[in-house]
């Protein structure tokens, strides 16, 4: 019974967060919405990335509990030029061995967790995501030097309620 209660609570929290984000997104329009409107809907960004030429990208991270991260680009004129959910299989395919971990962070946002493994000398950077239609997965970037990608992998999110996690 306790597991069902935790599963129901986790599902309700996830649906509420997704619903809120969808409502916020529907209220914004590329080319028209201002940075003030974006911040009014989404709040203070987790990080602001300089794009050069006066443009910048606002990171709205939904990790560790959620499965989405949003990058919202504000052009030099102060209007929203792009709103992207970046935790997708297409974006993961662009993460390649040798890539700088800073670039990975820039593309995907802050990971859900970072776990060092002393015996193997590896560090795993994990992002939760939904693989269509609604399968909870984990994208992992593995580094052996702390600076670059050694390899990547996709697997089930073992922390998800359906796998006995929280």
Give, region by region, the residue ranges found by the protein language model.
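Sec-dependent bacterial lipoprotein signal peptides
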Residues: 1-18
């Amino acid at each position: 019974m306790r597991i069902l209660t935790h599963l129901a609570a986790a599902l309700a929290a996830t649906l509420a967060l997704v619903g809120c984000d969808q409502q916020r997104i529907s209220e914004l329009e590329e080319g028209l919405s201002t940075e003030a409107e974006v911040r009014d809907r989404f709040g203070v960004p987790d990080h602001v990335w300089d794009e050069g030429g006066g443009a910048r990208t606002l990171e709205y991270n939904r990790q560790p509990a959620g499965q989405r991260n949003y990058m919202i680009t504000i052009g030099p004129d102060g209007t929203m030029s792009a709103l992207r959910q970046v935790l997708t299989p297409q974006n993961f395919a662009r993460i390649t061995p040798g890539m700088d971990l800073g670039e990975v962070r820039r593309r995907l946002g802050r990971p859900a967790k970072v776990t060092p493994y002393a015996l193997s000398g590896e560090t795993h950077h994990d992002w939760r995501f939904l693989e269509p239609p609604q399968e909870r997965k984990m994208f992992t970037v593995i580094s052996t030097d702390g600076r670059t990608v050694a390899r990547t992998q996709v697997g089930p999110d073992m922390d998800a309620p359906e796998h006995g996690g929280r």
